[in-house]
Amino acid sequence: SAAALALLLCAGQVIALPVNSPMNKGDTEVMKCIVEVISDTLSKPSPMPVSQECFETLRGDERILSILRHQNLLKELQDLALQGAKERSHQQKKQSSYEDELSEVLEKQNDQAELKEGTEEASSKEAAEKRGDSKEVEKNDEDADGAKPQASLEPPXXXEAEDQTPGEEEAASTHPLASLPSKKRPGAQAEEDHEGPSQGPVDREKGPSAEQGPQAEREEEEEAEAGEKAVPEEEGPRSEAFDSHPSLGYKEMQRGWPQAPAMDGAGKTGAEEAQPPEGKGAREHSRQEEEEETAGAPQGLFRGGKRGEPAQEEEERLSEEWENAKRWSKMDRLAKELTAEKRLQGEEEEEEEEEDPDRSMKLSFRAPAYGFRGPGLQLRRGWRPSSREDSVEAGLPLQVRXYLEEKKEEEGSANRRPEDQELESLSAIEAELEKVAPQLQSLRRG
C-alpha cells in the first residue's frame, strides 16, 4: 500500500510539470521583453536599454499590436470627446450672446414705449388744461351775458309791432336775413331801439293810406345804416373771441338763437310776423327743437353760475359728448334752414321785381355788402352768406369745422398710437426670431 501511494504521488508530480512547447517558448520571450521595457521605463535615472531582439519580438506579436491599437482608439475617443465639449461650450456662448441681444432689443422697445406713453400723457394733460381754461372763459362769458339787461327791449318791440303798417310788413318780408335768429350787443340794440320809437310817430302820421314803395325803401336804407354802425362795434371784440376759441363763439351764437325774437329790432319782429306761412312754420319748428335741446342739455354747459363746485369730471365728460352731438345736428339743421330761406328769398325777389323794377335794381346793388362784410355782420344778421349757395361753412363756420376736424384727428391719432406701437414691437420681435431660427436649427443638427 505504501508503494502504491508513492507511485501515485510521483505520477501527480509528473503530470503537473509543464511541457516545453514552441508556444510556451514564444510567450516566455514576450514576457521577458515586456519585463525589460517596464524596467527601462521605471529606471529612468539609470536607464537599462532594451535589446534589439525584444523590440523585434514585441513588434511581431499580434497581441501587443492589438493592445496598442486599442490604446490609440481610446486616445482618439478622448480627443473627440474633448472637441465635442469645446464645441458645446462655444455653442452655449453663442446662444447666450443671442439671448442677450434679444433682451437688449426688447428693453430698448420697452423704453421707447414708455417714452411714448409719457409724451402722450403729457399731451393729454395739456389738452385737459386747455379745455379747463376754455370752460372757465365760457363760464365768465355766460355770467357776463346773464348780467346784461334784456327786459328793456320788450316794450318798444311791442309798441313798434302795433305801429307797423302794411307797407312795413311788406318791406320786412323782403329781408329773409331777419328770419334767422341772431345775438346782438347792447350798443346795436340801443341804436335800433332809438330808431324804432322815432319811426313810430311818422308811421302813425302817414297812416295806411301812404304809399308802400318809397316807405319800404326808406326803411331798408335806415336798417342798412344801423347795421353799418353796429358792425364796427361788434367786429373788434367778437372777432377776437371767435379767433381765440372758435367753439366758444359758436356756442354763444347757438345760445343767442332762442333769444333773438326779443333782442332783434322792432322792424325785424314785424318782418318775422309778415313772412309767408311756409317759412314761418319752418322757423317755429326749428326754434322749438332748439328750445327742447337747450332744455335737455346739462345745466353746467350753459349756466356757469349754477355750478356749486368748479369742474366735476363726470359732468364735463357728459357735456363734451353732448356738445359734439349737438354741433353736428345744429350744422345740419342750419343748412336746411338756409336752403329754405334762400328758396323763399328767391321767390320774394322775383315777385318784387315784377312789382317794382327800380327797387330790384337797388337791392341787387346792395346785396354784395352782405357777402363781403365779414363774419361779424353775417352773425348779427343770422349767419347767412348770400352769394355762397354751396358752402354752409362760410365765415365763422369754417373756423368751427376746422377746429372740430383737428380735434377728431387728435383723438384718432391718440387711439392709433398704442396699436401702432404694438405692431412695431411685434414686427421687430418677429424679425429677430427669423434671424435666430436658422442658427438654432444648425446647432440642433450639429
Swiss-Prot record:
- Spell out the Basic and acidic residues composition-biased ranges: 105-138, 226-243, 319-346, 403-420
Answer whether the UniProt record assigns the keyword Disulfide bond to this protein.
yes
GO BP, one example? negative regulation of insulin secretion
* One Pfam family matching this protein: Granin
Report the sequence similarity comment from the record: Belongs to the chromogranin/secretogranin protein family.
Q: Spell out which residues are annotated as carrying Glycine amide.
A: 304
- PTM annotation (Methionine sulfoxide): residues: 361
Q: Which Cys pairs are S-S linked?
A: 33-54
Name this polypeptide is given: Chromogranin-A
According to the UniProt record, list the residues that bear Phosphoserine. 97, 209, 286, 319, 360, 387, 391, 413, 427
Q: How does it assemble?
A: Self-interacts; self-assembly is promoted in vitro by chondroitin sulfate attachment which occurs at mildly acidic pH conditions. Interacts with SCG3. Interacts with ITPR1 in the secretory granules.
Further information in the entry reads: Binds calcium with a low-affinity.
Highest taxon above the source species: Eukaryota
- The residue ranges flagged as biased composition, category Acidic residues, are 160-171, 347-357
User: Is Glycoprotein among this UniProt entry's keywords?
Assistant: yes
Q: Which InterPro entries match?
A: Chromogranin_AB, Chromogranin_CS, Granin
Q: Where is the signal peptide?
A: 1-16
Q: Which residues are glycosylated?
A: 413
Q: Where in the cell is it found?
A: Cytoplasmic vesicle, Secretory vesicle; Cytoplasmic vesicle, Secretory vesicle, Neuronal dense core vesicle; Secreted
Segments carrying the region annotation (Disordered) are 85-426
Q: How is it modified after translation?
A: O-glycosylated; contains chondroitin sulfate (CS). CS attachment is pH-dependent, being observed at mildly acidic conditions of pH 5 but not at neutral pH, and promotes self-assembly in vitro. Parathyroid CHGA is sulfated on tyrosine residues, whereas adrenal CHGA seems to be mainly sulfated on oligosaccharide residues.
Keywords on this record?
Amidation, Calcium, Cleavage on pair of basic residues, Cytoplasmic vesicle, Disulfide bond, Glycoprotein, Oxidation, Phosphoprotein, Proteoglycan, Secreted, Signal, Sulfation
Say which species the protein is native to.
Sus scrofa (Pig)
Q: What cellular component terms from Gene Ontology apply here?
A: chromaffin granule; extracellular space; neuronal dense core vesicle; secretory granule; transport vesicle
